[in-house]
Amino acid sequence: MDAIRKQASRLREQVARQQQAVFKQFGGGGYGSGLADEAELNQHQKLEKLYISTRAAKHYQRDIVRGVEGYIVTGSKQVEIGTKLSEDSRKYGSENTCTNGNVLTRAALNYGRARAQMEKERGNMLKALGTQVAEPLRAMVLGAPLEDARHLAQRYDRMRQEAEAQATEVARRQAKARESQGNPDILMKLESAEAKLHDLKSNMTILGKEAASALASVEDQQQKLTLERLLSMVESERAYHQRVLQILDQLEGEMVSERQRIEAPSTPSSADSMPPPPSYEEANGVFASQMHDTSTDSMGYFLGEVLFPYHGVTDVELSLSTGEYVVVRKVTGSGWAEGECKGKAGWFPYGYIERRERVLASKVSEVF
């Protein structure tokens, strides 16, 4: 009995050593098994990294699609609310029920028009996000190339596990063959097991290369497409906000002008009742001693906003439109002012403008 137990123990130790050696060769347990085994290990590690990379990119693409879809749903609701507000503003403006002027009526109409334009721009942006961002990414997440590449990697992994199991079987039969003292049947089974292991290893190498190539191609497509779609999303949102800013700037100017109509005094008397504008010689000479209170010589130039339009009659008069800004250089006691607007200089009624201490830089640039 003791002899049998000792023999069984020796056999177990021998099989364990052989299994360890085979696992090193086929399981990547060491680098001393030759160039082919090192290449197989590198192939296996490369496939693992590619699999993780493509899976993470797929999840990120899916997150972008979900985020964009949620943004579209929320934005569509905002478009609906904004459109309703636009219609209400237009309705109030068109009914014109106010008995004390129509300033608010015009402001409501302007707001309704601008709000409709902004909601149209928002709708265009949401449409672009759907067609240019969500749809291409969704197509790639659900596309065949990614699934095919991942299936190849999974087949490779299963074949690798099968090769490891077959390597264990070869080790077991090798031990049995040594104990059988040349039994033909056992040797034949060993040769068959070794041939199967060789075929598995060859097929595993070929399949690993195919899977790595397919996954690398998918990874490259994922990186490029996702970056392009992110850039497209940024460009769409940027264009939307720029357009909305332009609409709001114009709307603000219109509404400020309407507010000034309420705050400003009634339109000044017609320039026809005023004396003609002085010549530049008179302004520089005769009037120099008469402008102690009204001349700008002592206080410098200043900017004025045009409250009422003025159409010049003579060559020395300056035509102005409501909302424009003019650099006032001289004011006479007769009610005339001299200044420059949009590169043109001339005289105009001083009562048609109002001095402004603070002016947007964009408005100042329009003066010259």
Swiss-Prot record:
InterPro entries: AH/BAR_dom_sf (IPR027267), Endophilin_SH3RF (IPR050384), SH3-like_dom_sf (IPR036028), SH3_domain (IPR001452). Keywords: Cell membrane, Coiled coil, Cytoplasm, Cytoplasmic vesicle, Endosome, Membrane, SH3 domain. GO terms for cellular component: autophagosome membrane; cell plate; clathrin-coated vesicle; cytosol; endosome; late endosome; nucleus; plasma membrane. Pfam families: SH3_9. Changing residue 154 to E: Reduced binding to PtdIns(3,4,5)P(3)-containing vesicles and lower capacity to mediate the tubulation of liposomes. Impaired binding to PtdIns(3,4,5)P(3)-containing vesicles. Its main location: cytoplasm. CDD domains: BAR_SH3P_plant. Knockdown of SH3P2 is developmentally lethal and significantly suppresses autophagosome formation. One of its GO terms (biological process) is clathrin-dependent endocytosis. Disruption phenotype: Delayed germination, but almost normal growth after germination in sh3p2 partial mutants. RNAi plants exhibit cytokinesis-defective phenotypes associated with the aggregation of vesicles at the leading edge of the cell plate and abnormal cytosolic localization of DRP1A in dividing cells. Regulator for autophaosome formation and/or maturation. Binds phosphatidylinositol-phosphate; highest affinity for vesicles containing PtdIns(3,4,5)P(3), followed by those containing PtdIns(4,5)P(2) and PtdIns(3,4)P(2), with minimal binding to phosphatidylinositol monophosphates, including PtdIns(3)P. Together with DRP1A, converts the fused vesicles to tubular structures at the cell plate during cytokinesis. Homodimer. Interacts with FREE1. Interacts (via SH3 domain) with ATG8E and ATG8F. Component of a phosphoinositide 3-kinase (PI3K) complex containing ATG6, SH3P2 and FREE1. Binds to SH3P3 and DRP1A. Forms a complex made of SH3P2 and DRP1A and triggers its accumulation at the cell plate. This is SH3 domain-containing protein 2. It is found in: Cytoplasm; Cytoplasmic vesicle, Clathrin-coated vesicle; Cell membrane; Late endosome.
